[in-house]
Amino acid sequence: MTPFFLNSVLGGVLATLFMDVASMLVRVTGLTAGAPPSTIGKWFTYLFHGRLIHGDIMASPEIPIRMPLVGALHYGIGIALAGAFAALCSWQQPQRGAFAFAVGFGVLTTVLAWFLMFPAMGWGIAGTRGPAQLLLTRTSLVNHALYGLGLALWSAFLAPLLIRSKA
């Protein structure tokens, strides 16, 4: 396996895991409040049934949520984003100087939630029509910054120990 592939997969999984754990810890401070996982799971599950856009996801009929598929999609997105980050960096072996860039990249991925996911859930751009509008917007920003921090930690500390690049 190539260093690029390993960095994409391992970096994506670890950055997503870091985001998931850190966001739970941040949530207890009251700074953020996640949309209920069942709501996001409902939207993801509807994707598997061919429906992307909802008037309001909360009002859409209940559907059996396939959490293993939802989890796989969640981590798959994390891997794909880590691959995009790696490609932007021409990342064979991550560099310690990419720390700030990784956090910035994580923040930049917020546009996916603000301009794709929230509007598709019927919550408007940046969640401005969703439940607890600004809290939802801030939560997305914080969570994606945490994903970027996970990428930064991977690239600065773990990848150099675990992946040998062909020089």
Whereabouts are the PLM-identified features?
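Juxtamembrane/disordered regions of integral membrane proteins
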Residues: 1-167
